[in-house]
Curated annotation (Swiss-Prot):
Its job: A phosphoprotein adapter involved in the XPO1-mediated U snRNA export from the nucleus. Bridge components required for U snRNA export, the cap binding complex (CBC)-bound snRNA on the one hand and the GTPase Ran in its active GTP-bound form together with the export receptor XPO1 on the other. Its phosphorylation in the nucleus is required for U snRNA export complex assembly and export, while its dephosphorylation in the cytoplasm causes export complex disassembly. It is recycled back to the nucleus via the importin alpha/beta heterodimeric import receptor.
Keywords tagged on the record: Acetylation, Cytoplasm, Nucleus, Phosphoprotein, Protein transport, RNA-binding, Transport
Residue numbers carrying Phosphoserine: S14, S16, S65, S66, S69, S73, S226, S356, S368
Positions bearing Phosphothreonine: T296
Protein name according to UniProt: Phosphorylated adapter RNA export protein
Positions of region (Necessary for poly U RNA-binding and snRNA export): 279-287
Gene Ontology cellular component list: Cajal body; cytosol; neuronal cell body; nucleoplasm; nucleus; ribonucleoprotein complex
Region described as Sufficient for poly U RNA-binding: spans on this chain: 228-328
C-alpha cells in the first residue's frame, strides 16, 4: 500500500474507496444530455424527490412509479382545490335596500349581533321626533321595543303626568276659591298682606325679589314722635309689606324699643344679614327685625303672643281649610270606590256590614263639611311660634 502511495504522482487520486468516502448527498447528479420519453420523466421525479425539503405542514407520500403519478395527479389537484375552498370564505353579497319597510332588521338566528351604537341612537331620536309629532296631532305613536323589558312607555308617562298636573291645578283653584270665600282678593289686601294665600307656595311667588333695606329713610324719627309716624317709617325702611304687623309691634313695645330694633337690624344687614333656619336663603329686612324682636330678653312672651296673634290665627285657619279640603277629596274617592265595587248576591252579611260602615264614614264626612265655623282661638290657645320660619310672613 505504501508503494502504491509512493508511486503516485503529485495531484493523482487513488482509485480505492477506503481513502476517501463521499456522502450520497454530496455526489453530483449526472444526467444524460439527451433524454426522451419515460426516462426524462423518471429522472425529473427522482431529482424532485431528492431535492425536496422536509416539511411538517403538509405530508405528501412519495410516488414510486410513473403510472401511479399519472393516475393520482388529477386526484391530488382536486384535493388541493377542496382544501383551498375551505380556507377562504367568500364575502356575503349585500342585500338590496327595500323601500317602505322599517330600517330595523330582525336578528339572524345564530348570527352575531352588530354593536351599532350610533345607529341605535339615531333611530331612537327619529322615533322620538315621530312620537312628538303624533302627540301634537292627538295620536299615540309606537314605542321602540328593542330593549324588551327595559322599554319605557314615555308616551303614557307624559300623558299621566299631564293629567296629574291638571288635577292638581283644579284642586289648588278650588282651595283658593274656598279660602277667599268666592271673592277675588283686592290689591290693597295684597299690599297689606291680609289676603288668604295658599300654603306651601314657592319662595319667589310669596316674596318675589328680595328687598333691600333703605338705611337713610325719608326722615328722622325719635321716641317723641307718634306711633303712626314711627310705624310708617320703620315699614318704609324695612321694605315690609305687612304694615299692620309693624304697627302692632310699635304699639305693644313702644317707640323707643322699636327704634332700637331698627338700628340693630340695619347693623345686621350691613354685615351680611341672617339666614333662615335651614340656611337655604337670607331673611328679608322685615324678617331680621322680627327675629331680633323674638330674641330680645326684655320683651316678654305675652307681648310676642299679642303681636303675632292675628298671624297665628290665619295660619290655623289655613291649616284647617287644607285639612277640610283633604277630607272632601277623600270622601269623593270613597264614593267613587263604592260605586265601582261589585258584591256577590250570595254574600249578604259582608254587604250589609260594609254598607253600614261606609254610611257611617260618609255621614261623619258630611257632618264635618256641613258643620258651622268654629270659634276663633283665644289668646291663651294661640299657636306659639318658636322660629321665624313657622310663619309665612317673611
Amino acid at each position: 500500500m505504501a508503494l502504491e502511495v509512493g508511486d503516485m504522482e503529485d495531484g493523482q487520486l487513488s482509485d480505492s474507496d477506503s481513502d476517501m468516502t463521499v456522502a450520497p448527498s454530496d455526489r453530483p447528479l449526472q444526467l444524460p444530455k439527451v433524454l426522451g420519453g419515460d426516462s426524462a420523466m423518471r429522472a425529473f421525479q427522482n431529482t424532485a424527490t431528492a431535492c425536496a425539503p422536509v416539511s411538517h405542514y403538509r405530508a405528501v407520500e412519495s410516488v414510486d412509479s410513473s403510472e401511479e403519478s399519472f393516475s393520482d395527479s388529477d386526484d391530488d389537484s382536486c384535493l388541493w382545490k377542496r382544501k383551498r375552498q375551505k380556507c377562504f370564505n367568500p364575502p356575503p353579497k349585500p342585500e338590496p335596500f327595500q323601500f317602505g319597510q322599517s330600517s330595523q332588521k330582525p336578528p339572524v338566528a345564530g348570527g352575531k349581533k352588530i354593536n351599532n351604537i350610533w345607529g341605535a341612537v339615531l333611530q331612537e331620536q327619529n322615533q322620538d321626533a315621530v312620537a312628538t309629532e303624533l302627540g301634537i296631532l292627538g295620536m299615540e305613536g309606537t314605542i321602540d321595543r328593542s330593549r324588551q323589558s327595559e322599554t319605557y312607555n314615555y308616551l303614557l308617562a307624559k300623558k299621566l303626568r299631564k293629567e296629574s298636573q291638571e288635577h292638581t291645578k283644579d284642586l289648588d283653584k278650588e282651595l283658593d276659591e274656598y279660602m277667599h270665600g268666592g271673592k277675588k282678593m283686592g290689591s290693597k289686601e295684597e299690599e297689606n298682606g291680609q289676603g288668604h294665600l295658599k300654603r306651601k307656595r314657592p319662595v319667589k311667588d310669596r316674596l318675589g325679589n328680595r328687598p333691600e333695606m333703605n338705611y337713610k329713610g325719608r326722615y328722622e324719627i325719635t321716641a317723641e314722635d307718634s306711633q303712626e309716624k314711627v310705624a310708617d317709617e320703620i315699614s318704609f325702611r324695612l321694605q315690609e309689606p305687612k304694615k299692620d304687623l309693624i304697627a302692632r309691634v310699635v304699639r305693644i313695645i313702644g317707640n323707643k324699643k322699636a327704634i332700637e330694633l331698627l338700628m340693630e337690624t340695619a347693623e345686621v344687614e350691613q354685615n351680611g344679614g341672617l339666614f333662615i333656619m335651614n340656611g337655604s336663603r337670607r331673611r328679608t329686612p322685615g324678617g331680621v327685625f322680627l327675629n331680633l324682636l323674638k330674641n330680645t330678653p326684655s320683651i316678654s312672651e305675652e307681648q310676642i303672643k299679642d303681636i303675632f296673634y292675628i298671624e297665628n290665627q290665619k295660619e290655623y285657619e289655613n291649616k284647617k281649610a287644607a285639612r277640610k279640603r283633604r277630607t272632601q277629596v277623600l270622601g269623593k274617592k270613597m264614593k267613587q270606590a263604592i260605586k265601582s265595587l261589585n258584591f256577590q248576591e250570595d254574600d249578604d252579611t259582608s254587604r250589609e256590614t260594609f254598607a253600614s260602615d261606609t254610611n257611617e264614614a260618609l255621614a261623619s264626612l258630611d257632618e264635618s263639611q256641613e258643620g258651622h265655623a268654629e270659634a276663633k282661638l283665644e289668646a291663651e290657645e294661640a299657636i306659639e311660634v318658636d322660629h321665624s320660619h313657622d310663619l309665612d310672613i317673611f
